[in-house]
Amino acid sequence: MRVEFVRGLRRLWRHPLFRRLVAVRIATQASDGTLQIGMAAYVLFSPQQQPDAASIALVLAITLLPFSIIGPFVSLTLDRWNRRQVAVVTDVIRVGIALLLGVLVLNPELREHWTMWLFYAGVLVAMSLNRYLLAGLSAALQHTVDEDEYLIASSVMPTIGPAGVLVGAAVAFGIRFGTGAVLESYQADALVFTTAAAGFALTVVLALRIPRRALGPDLDSAEAQTTPTREVLQGLVHAVGHLRERRPAGIGLVTIGVQRVLYGMTQVATILLFRNWFHRVEEVDAAMADIGMWAGATGAGFIASAALVPPLARRVGVRRSIVVVLVAAGVLQVLPGSIFTLWTLVAAGFGLGICSQSLKICVDTLVQAHVDDDFKGRVFTLYDMIFNACFVLAACLTALLLPADGHTLIGFVALGVLLALTGVAFWLRTHKMGSPTFDRGTAFEEASSGASRAG
């Protein structure tokens, strides 16, 4: 499996544009990971307060929902504006935002001051720009690889994101824990945000190495050439209509939305377990260490999925792969994911990370292969909207349905059962479409079609 992954990566690596796009993706997501850990540490891990699902939901709503609402109104620009320039401009802006956040947290009384809302606004804009940029980079991917390399590229790029985030998170954790003896916590937070600013500046330099028009978009269709940017609602309607015509991509987005709610509830409940059930409110460092171990295992699962999905999909096809990872996620959520010890939850985090990211790779592949380039910017922004809004919904449902400390055996088992049932529902819903339809745009398309005819 590892050999096939390395072989596929080597095949992609021969494309200079792909290499440069990878560099931009790693740098921007590492910087964003540093910024996110800085924000989470400052807001959620104060020794004076104990977070609950409602407070987590509030933070997620502030940082994720605004772009989920306005996403359709800006997605059309990714099908009209130069995508290389989008990368440059967004991270220039984020350099300034990260420096502003670093200055704000130097005020020890910030939480009681009106400028705390300026802090939230800065985080909101920075994270919204990150999602806008990632949608543009995803839409640009097809300009960097050959058509039959979509599956390999779609397995590598979503994995690069978590890998970059892990690097950035490790840097942020290292600053927080490594400077604890010499700096106050708010000073360490300021250093974290300043480091994130340096990372965004590096991303700008890397993006400028890409030729200005190399990432598209290709304005080939009459609609793409004539639709005014202000007609964003019409553009969104057209994108949804396009997804109805390209049913594998549309059904894939619905499926990952359901999975995101269920998996998101698991993640929020697990954070509450580590923060509120395993540890007392004042034991911030111990709680952060446990959450860091669990998050690291989850991130390792994300990375491992890149080596798993191509050989799995080559053997059974994209459609069956989606079913396999959803059912496997359900089983892992029940056992070991419903045993409340540190190591069982860490093990479950790794397994669920593999399954979750494997599903995303499959859905990314469906969107890349079935959606026309004229619609890719809008569809990937719609995808991002679903992905993040469903996570906020998951936090809200956790606050409503699960205990404040996250400790509920019935709840964790029920989430596992629902994940498995999602896989079964996907299999039944797509039965008439057939597996070869889902394998379009992959290196094993012809073999899959032949196997289907033989069966």
Model feature map: region roles:
Residues 22-41, 176-193, 235-306:
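A single, central transmembrane helix in multi-pass transporters
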Residues 34, 38-67:
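Extracellular/periplasmic helix-loop-helix junction of adjacent transmembrane segments
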Residues 20-36, 62-78, 82-97, 118-179, ...:
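Substrate-agnostic recognition of the 12-TM MFS/MFS-like secondary transporter fold
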Residues 1-19, 213-254, 444-450:
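Juxtamembrane intracellular "pre-TM" segments in multi-pass secondary transporters
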Residues 108, 139, 143, 189, ...:
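Helix-loop junctions on the cytosolic side of multi-pass membrane transporters
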Residues 38-47, 102-111, 167-193, 272, ...:
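Transmembrane alpha-helix termini and helix-breaking/packing motifs in multi-pass membrane transporters
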Residues 14-22, 53, 112-120, 245-253, ...:
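Primarily residues marking transmembrane-helix entry/exit sites
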Residues 2, 57, 62, 69, ...:
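C-terminal transmembrane bundle of multi-pass solute transporters/carriers
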